[in-house]
């Protein structure tokens, strides 16, 4: 199967993922191969809310948020395969082998490369890598589970 190139901007991403500011961590999808692979971009700026406290005078993107960005990229890939995606959420079921190799700082552009290891209708295991330029910043294996999305309260 030929690799599908597909660019999605943040507006397109918001049609797939339920995340919003300040926790939407994807700015663009630059590669998308159904049920196999996704490559997404996160542009990191000093305006990120987490830099206020992590760490004053030495801003570093929290590693857990890099892993979250990997999971969001995987979610963007896999939720498109769910027929009733507006009624489902993809949530963490596990994080394995997370390694942080290089700090991510304001001004960096993080390239998230996520490959499907196992895909089932209700769960997936993904291998993700986050790069800044050609340097590996983070890698992790994440497991996700698809669950029903709670109904919105009528007054929201």
From Swiss-Prot:
CDD domains referenced in this protein's UniProt entry, alphabetically = FabZ
Name one matching Pfam family. FabA
Q: Which sites are catalytic? A: 54
Assigned EC number = 4.2.1.59
What's in the GO CC field? cytoplasm; membrane
Q: Which cysteines are joined by disulfide bonds?
A: none
Predominantly, its location class is cytoplasm
SUPFAM superfamilies listed in its UniProt record: Thioesterase/thiol ester dehydrase-isomerase
Molecular function, one GO term: (3R)-hydroxyacyl-[acyl-carrier-protein] dehydratase activity
Gene3D superfamilies in UniProt: Hotdog Thioesterase
Q: Which UniProt keywords apply?
A: Cytoplasm, Lipid A biosynthesis, Lipid biosynthesis, Lipid metabolism, Lyase
Q: Which locations, inside or outside the cell, does it occupy?
A: Cytoplasm
Q: Which GO terms describe its biological process?
A: fatty acid biosynthetic process; lipid A biosynthetic process
Catalytic function, reaction form: a (3R)-hydroxyacyl-[ACP] = a (2E)-enoyl-[ACP] + H2O
Similarity comment: family membership: Belongs to the thioester dehydratase family. FabZ subfamily.
- Stored PANTHER family: 3-HYDROXYACYL-[ACYL-CARRIER-PROTEIN] DEHYDRATASE
Q: What does this protein do?
A: Involved in unsaturated fatty acids biosynthesis. Catalyzes the dehydration of short chain beta-hydroxyacyl-ACPs and long chain saturated and unsaturated beta-hydroxyacyl-ACPs.
The name this protein carries in UniProt is 3-hydroxyacyl-[acyl-carrier-protein] dehydratase FabZ
Q: Which gene encodes it?
A: fabZ
């Amino acid at each position: 199967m030929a690799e599908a190139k597909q660019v999605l901007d943040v507006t397109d991403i918001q049609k797939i993922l339920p995340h919003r500011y300040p926790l939407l961590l994807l700015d663009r999808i630059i590669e998308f191969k159904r049920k196999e692979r996704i490559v997404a971009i996160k542009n990191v700026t000093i305006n990120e809310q987490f830099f206020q406290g992590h760490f004053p005078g030495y801003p570093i993107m929290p590693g857990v948020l890099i892993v979250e960005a990997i999971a969001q990229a995987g979610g963007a890939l896999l939720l498109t395969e769910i027929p009733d995606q507006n009624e489902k959420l993809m949530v963490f079921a596990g994080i394995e082998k997370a390694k942080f190799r290089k700090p991510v700082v304001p001004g960096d552009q993080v390239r998230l490369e996520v490959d499907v290891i196992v895909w089932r209708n209700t769960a997936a295991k993904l291998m993700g890598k986050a790069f800044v330029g050609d340097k590996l910043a983070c890698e992790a294996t994440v497991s996700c589970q698809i669950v029903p999305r709670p109904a919105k309260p009528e007054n929201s």
